[in-house]
Design a protein with these regions (language model features):
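Short alpha-helical
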Residues: 16, 41, 68
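Conserved residues at beta->alpha junctions
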Residues: 12, 37, 64
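Thioredoxin-like thiol-disulfide oxidoreductase module
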Residues: 36-54, 79
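Terminal leader/tail segments of proteins
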Residues: 23, 27-34, 38, 44, ...
């Protein structure tokens, strides 16, 4: 897990996959910074911060790299051997 040091979660209100991502980070013991869609002054500011024109939430950046949404996060964590194919933490 040592190679995952800086996590940013772009989220918005009432987003079930945002909540799933937060819970997963907590269960894995990963610290993260949450940036809420509603806190950006405009959509361009969000695009600039994320580094891409994002179309859905959540969006996750790890160590400066935009991973993508929740499904891409699960794929990333499977590759790191931190979760199983169901997205459950591997103990």
């Amino acid at each position: 897990m040592s190679d995952i040091s800086h996590v940013i979660l772009y989220s918005k209100k009432n987003c079930s996959y945002c909540i799933k991502a937060k819970n997963l980070f907590i269960n894995l013991g990963l610290n993260y910074t949450e940036k809420k869609f509603e806190d950006f002054k405009n959509i361009e500011a969000l695009f600039e911060d994320a580094g891409k024109q994002v179309r859905s939430m959540p969006q996750i950046k790890i160590n400066g790299q935009l991973i993508g949404g929740y499904n891409q996060l699960i794929e990333y964590l499977i590759d790191k051997k931190l979760v199983n194919f169901k997205g459950e933490p591997i103990k």
